[in-house]
């Protein structure tokens, strides 16, 4: 049994992590560390988890124990920089669910997050944990940068095409739609029900922090053209739906495209290739990423759907943790979807 610490475990992603940990046969002690929530009982914050998790005290982030085997860090950007370097120095395994270690270049992080990166050397040892796509040597991995929610939905659906047909691409862009839980638990006027009910709106147009993260990985796969993503809010709590449009400079073989996707995800436990564009309800409450690829003339339309809190955060983090300890990657992960 392993001991686990969740630093910043009182948000939406922390709640999902707690549920998965409670369902995991290889996880023993779980400690939750918080800032303002320190000193509270866990079930005071999450009464819905009664009979699911132990009602322990939330500990202060100023007194993080060295005794855990692995740490999930689910803090706002910038704050993880205060804790992760010392944990790595002590030989601990860390999975960061925030954005502080996703970039390869510290200057790119500083440009988009407006924060000086105080542990840039760790960017050289971190692994970008897109677990369903990259073949990571987890036996030698200390620090996993868990991908963002939008990047997960886009990269899993688009990377197989980029890797095999990058020289055919003229333009590529994505429209993504997210539930309001992606903004976290802090009170925001624009997230009130009276603001979002029956409403859809774009936000952070040409300025979303996930755009350079996605671009970084697409460029590694061979993308030569520019990339853009336009993010929108949906009047739902959970889920991300992404539609990527690729304009080609030449015709390609549709069967070959589908074959490449089938080959890539043939053994995947959590990526499902669909014959029709997925519905968001197919994946909400699950760790699945559902993908459909349509090729017609010189246009490729790729749609994907994920649960932003699970596949886009805690579920993928649990997959990465399982891989780090050579467990079955499905352990602990709960799939309670509306429909599948």
Please state what every model-predicted region is:
Residues 11, 77-78, 148, 208, ...:
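Short, surface-exposed acidic/glycine-rich loop or hinge patches that mediate macromolecular interfaces
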Residues 18, 155-162, 211-215, 258, ...:
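Predominant activation on well-ordered alpha-helical scaffold segments within soluble catalytic domains
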């Amino acid at each position: 049994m392993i001991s686990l610490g969740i630093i910043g475990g009182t948000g939406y992603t922390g709640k999902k992590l707690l549920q998965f940990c409670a369902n995991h046969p290889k996880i023993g002690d779980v400690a939750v560390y918080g800032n303002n929530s320190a000193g509270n009982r866990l079930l005071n914050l999450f009464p819905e988890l009664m009979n699911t998790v132990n009602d322990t005290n939330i500990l202060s982030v100023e007194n993080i124990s060295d005794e855990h085997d692995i740490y999930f860090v689910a803090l706002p950007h910038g704050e993880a920089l205060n804790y992760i370097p010392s944990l790595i120095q002590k030989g601990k395994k860390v999975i960061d669910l925030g954005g502080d270690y996703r970039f390869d270049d510290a200057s790119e992080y500083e440009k988009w997050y407006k924060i000086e990166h105080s542990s840039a050397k760790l960017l050289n040892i971190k692994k970008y944990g897109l677990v369903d796509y990259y073949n990571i040597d987890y036996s030698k991995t200390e620090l996993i940068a868990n991908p963002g929610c939008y990047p997960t939905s886009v990269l899993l659906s688009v990377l197989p095409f980029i890797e095999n047909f990058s020289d055919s691409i003229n333009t590529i862009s994505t429209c993504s739609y997210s539930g309001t839980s992606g903004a976290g638990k802090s009170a925001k006027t624009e997230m009130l029900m009276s603001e979002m009910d029956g409403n859809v709106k774009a936000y952070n147009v040409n300025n979303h922090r996930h755009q350079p993260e996605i671009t970084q990985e697409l460029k590694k796969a061979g993308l030569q053209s520019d990339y853009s993503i336009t993010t929108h809010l949906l009047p739902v709590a959970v889920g991300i739906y992404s539609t990527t449009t690729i304009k080609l400079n030449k015709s390609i073989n549709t069967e070959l495209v589908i074959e490449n996707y089938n080959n890539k995800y043939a053994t995947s436990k959590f990526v499902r290739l669909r014959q029709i564009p997925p519905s968001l309800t197919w994946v909400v409450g699950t760790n699945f990423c559902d993908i459909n690829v349509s090729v017609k003339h010189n246009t490729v339309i790729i749609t994907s759907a994920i649960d932003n809190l699970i596949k886009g955060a805690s579920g993928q983090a649990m997959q990465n943790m399982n891989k780090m300890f050579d467990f079955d990657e499905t352990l602990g992960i709960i799939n309670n979807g509306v429909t599948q």
